[in-house]
Amino acid sequence: MGKNSRNTKSLIGVLACAAVPLTGWAQSSSLQIYGVMDLGLSSYRAEGAGSRQMLTSSGNQASRIGFRGYEALGDGMGAGFDMEAGLNADTGTGQVSNTNNQPSGATSNSSGALTFNRKSFLYLRSQSLGEIRLGRDYTPAFWNMFLYDPFRVGVGMSAHVLHGTTVTSFRASNSVGYLSPGCSGPGCKGLFFQGMIAFGENSGGPDRQNGRVYGARAGYGGKNWDAAVGLATTLNKAADDYAQYNAAASYLWQDHKFMVLVGENRTGNRIATLDNADRVRFWQLGAVWKVGAAGNIPMSFMRLTRNDASGSSSQKYAMGYVHNLSKRTALYGTYTYVDNKGSINLPVATGSLSGPIPVPGGNASGFDLGLRHSF
């Protein structure tokens, strides 16, 4: 009994000694697992194509799982990483990624394997000089489309205005990025700047520059208002490059937020599958109206025009309600109506949420009713 007691005391002593450096390490480093599960019932309709009912993922926030880590290096310096994988929460499968910012780089994901398609980067940060990022990340032009959209995802989102290629409309692989101080998160403070260059990593030939991305974003983030301009260009010989330009602003009045977004997406060559268009121009008005202590009403109106042979246009109306049951859990509902004119036939939603495709000039509508939980 005495021997066991002595052994126990020795073990406790060893663990106590070992805990000293571990405690010091824990004070300067962190590792976090985070994510969102978002599932809802959806019904989408399109003129000339019938309707579709389904269980969908990401109606209010994108379903995802991520891992991030950080180490303080001293003197205001730090290093870290962030890896985030998109989830099809309704089926338990992962989503596709892209390796070279070109259609040829789309990953095959027939098995539904997990990929860190949303972001996968390593960074070095200085409080006074800013942050350098290496890896797969959001393009500078994407942030205005996301931050100034009251819905951001689901049937209400504004990203249905894409033209040309969607490979780099949101993210780019093989990138080197810079973010000015105060701009490491989605919301930047004070005067700020973001820049990116990404590589298609082709070995040679006439298409060796394909997939190279150049992007920049600049603006100001204040207490009650902010504004920014963004641009990005993806080199592509067949389309004579793909360019995005946008500008946006928001104003917070009491607990209510108002947003405006304008932009243009263009290709150097006209695209035959888009009725020989080479340009889409759009603008959006949006708001998030606070209701009581736990609710808010997002709403938006977007209009786009396409310079095709038919002079096509589309208008999108969206309204929803989000009721927070707690800090991490919410119920939501969103309704959207899309009014297409000419040869354009935008569905009510795109991507994994895509509804039926209407006939050219046909209307589309749909709703999401769901539950979202973050961790």
Residue ranges and their predicted role:
Residues L31-L39, D75, A79-M83, I132, ...:
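Transmembrane beta-strands of outer-membrane beta-barrel proteins
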Residues M1-S30:
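Cleavable N-terminal export/targeting peptides
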Residues G50-M54, A106-S108, L162-G164, S203-G204, ...:
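Extracellular loop and loop/strand-boundary signature of outer-membrane beta-barrel proteins
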Residues G211-N324, Y335-Y337:
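Detector for outer-membrane/organellar transmembrane beta-barrel domains
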Residues L41-A49, L87-T93, P140-N144, E201-G205, ...:
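Gram-negative outer-membrane beta-barrel proteins
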Residues Q61-I65, R118-L122, A172-V176, Y214-A216, ...:
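Hydrophobic, lipid-facing positions within transmembrane beta-strands of outer-membrane proteins
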Residues S28-S43, R52-G200, N210, G219-K223:
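Outer membrane beta-barrel
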Residues H323-L325, Y337, V359-F375:
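Outer-membrane beta-barrel "beta-signal"
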